[in-house]
Amino acid sequence: VNHKSRRIQVTDTYAQSIAHMLKYDSLYDIFDADVQSKKDALLVDGREVKIFAEGDPALLPWKELGVDIVVESTGRINNPEEAAKHIQAGAKKVVLSGPAKGSECLTVVMGVNEDWYDPAVHHVVSNASCTTNCLAPVAKVMHEKFGIVKGLMTTVHAYTNDQQLLDMPHRDMRRARAANLSIIPTTTGAAKAVALVLPELKGKINGFSMRVPIPTVSVVD
C-alpha cells in the first residue's frame, strides 16, 4: 500500500480473508504493517482501505469517492468497453493490468513507449502482460543497437491459477496436468504483443511459454 496515494479502494470480497492473505503471504512472508479488517474495509497501519463487492463497474461509487485512476486487475475484465464502465462510475482513467482484447486500446510498456500516452485521448490503457513488460525493453535495446531481423523468445513461467493443482480436464490438454508436477509447453501472446509497443518488430518475433512447477519467478530468453 502506497502511503503517498490520496485514496485507495479495493473491489473484492471477504475483507477478513483479504486482510489475512495480505498479512501472511505463502511466498513473500509477513507484511511489515498492522493489518486489520472490518465489514467493508481493511485497516493498514490505521489507514482505511474500503472494499466493495460489486460485479458491475458502472455501479461502483468512484465519483462519490473522488477516484482518479482505477487499476483493473480482477482478471475478469480485459475489454476496453467493459473497463470504461469505471469511467461511467466517475473514475477519470483506467489501467488494465493485462493485455486488452476487443477494440483498439493503447498498450504502454514503461521504458518503451510511454511517450505515446496522451491524457486528452487515452482514458483506458493496457499495461500489457508481465512477459511483454519483460521482453519489450530488451527487444527495444537490441533492435536499436543491432537490429532484429527475426527473433524467437521463450518464457519460463511459474504456474498460474488457470492451471490445475491435480490432473483435471481442461480445454488445453497440456494444462490439464498437475501444475506442481509438470513442465507444460503452451502459447504466449507476448511476442505478438511486442508489436503493439514496437510496431517496427511486427511479424519478426515468435515464441512460446513453458509453465514450470514453481509458484513464483519467471524468466524470458
State each model region's role.
Residues 1-176:
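N-terminal Rossmann-like NAD(P) cofactor-binding subdomain of oxidoreductases
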Residues 145, 150-154, 161-221:
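C-terminal substrate-binding/catalytic lobe of Rossmann-fold NAD(P)-dependent dehydrogenases
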